[in-house]
Amino acid sequence: MTVHARSILSFVLGLSSLMVAVQVPAATPSEGWKVIDTSQSYSELLSHLKEAVSESDLQVVFDVGPTEAAAKRGIDIPGNRVIGVFNNEFAVDILSLSVPAMIEAPIRFYVTEGEHGQATLSWIQPSHIYAPYADSADTATSAKKLREKSKELDLLFSEIAINATQVK
């Protein structure tokens, strides 16, 4: 096979793969994800989420998303926001148990807007996020404590989510 024929074949195969990828619907969240569909609007859920975080033992560390920046460029996309949530107490405790695990902090809530304006709240359970770090901890004690901290965070995130998604 000539170099030219190989190039054409590679191009066609690549294009075919791209066409298949475009036709496949987006994957649903994987293991560890929690997803709550709501009847709230995107802006309502964002407001309720921030309020629920402020009433918890955690704080909003960051609040970012492409929606507003896209609008400034004249592009209209559905609401999409990532809210990073954590606190210094958990940061210090987790850092003392696993330096590599801190790359995961803050843990994120994900607020998305559906096609009819309703919002969805999603997050990955902290225990799922930190499990690989507990599995590879230096000591059994560190592993146990990291799992315990992760479970505490699971409860806090669930409480925040419940409070944010209740109809007000």
What do these predicted ranges mean?
Residues 26-85:
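N-terminal secretory signal peptides
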Residues 21-24:
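N-terminal signal peptide c-region/cleavage motif recognized by signal peptidases
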Residues 127-168:
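C-terminal partner/receptor-binding element of secreted or periplasmic proteins
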Residues 67-110:
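Mid-chain, structured segments of secreted extracytoplasmic proteins
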Residues 103-104, 108-138:
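Flexible, solvent-exposed short loops/turns enriched in glycine
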Residues 1-11:
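Bacterial N-terminal signal peptides that target proteins for export
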Residues 64-66, 87-89, 115, 125-127:
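A mature extracytoplasmic/lumenal domain signature
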Residues 45, 49, 66, 91, ...:
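Stable alpha-helical elements in mature extracytoplasmic
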